[in-house]
UniProtKB/Swiss-Prot annotation:
Gene that this sequence comes from: rpmC
Domain of life: Bacteria
GO molecular function: structural constituent of ribosome
InterPro entries xref list: Ribosomal_protein_uL29, Ribosomal_uL29, Ribosomal_uL29_sf
Family affiliation: Belongs to the universal ribosomal protein uL29 family.
GO biological process: translation
The UniProt record lists the keyword Lipoprotein: no
Protein name per Swiss-Prot or TrEMBL: Large ribosomal subunit protein uL29
One of the record's GO cellular component terms: cytosolic large ribosomal subunit
Record key words, sorted: Ribonucleoprotein, Ribosomal protein
Matching Gene3D superfamilies: 1.10.287.310
Length: 70
């Protein structure tokens, strides 16, 4: 899974970003659960999910700040 470019993330609507953030948080919860029960074999998925979550949260924060300043 390649990391999305910032420009690709910025093209998403606010609703899409919120939906993806919720999905990634659920995925991270599932990954932690799998790791705790020793069922997880691909530990690199943690890093990928955290990076994507950070990108989405950054774009969401940028939009909220620009809306507040306008």
């Amino acid at each position: 899974m390649a990391h999305p470019k910032a420009a690709e993330v910025r093209k998403l609507t606010d609703a899409d970003i919120t939906e993806q953030i919720d999905g990634i948080r659920r995925e991270l919860f599932d990954l932690r659960f799998q790791q705790a029960t020793r069922q997880l074999s691909n530990t690199h998925r943690f890093k990928e999910a955290r990076i994507k979550l950070a990108q989405l949260l950054t774009v969401q924060k940028e939009r909220s700040r620009s809306a507040a300043s306008s």
